[in-house]
Structure formats: structure tokens, C-alpha cells
């Protein structure tokens, strides 16, 4: 199982990072949410993908 952390800007995909470790993906998700917490047009989410 792999995990993608996706950053959306104005409802369009801006960047994407793929992790094989769920903990690393969660850490990156929290880091990016802190970075973009005051930017209304940015949204960060994590999704699971099959290999």
C-alpha cells in the first residue's frame, strides 16, 4: 500500500508526494497543513493507493 499526499490550489492539483510508509505520509500531511493553514485556496489531503 502506498500513500499520496496531495496539495490542491484553488481546487486544482498543485503537487503530489508518494510515500510507502503511512507514518511518513501522516507527518508530511501535518507539516503541509501547518504551512497552508492560513491560505484559504490551499487544501491538503492524503489518499491510499494500491501498488
What annotation goes with each model-predicted range?
Residues 1-15, 41-44:
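Short aromatic-glycine-(Arg/Gly/Cys) micro-motifs in beta-strand/loop hairpins
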Amino acid at each position: 500500500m502506498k500513500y499520496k499526499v496531495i496539495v490542491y490550489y484553488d481546487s486544482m492539483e498543485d503537487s503530489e508526494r508518494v510515500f510507502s510508509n503511512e507514518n511518513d505520509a501522516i507527518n508530511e500531511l501535518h507539516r503541509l497543513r501547518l504551512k497552508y493553514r492560513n491560505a484559504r485556496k490551499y487544501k491538503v489531503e492524503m489518499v491510499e493507493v494500491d501498488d
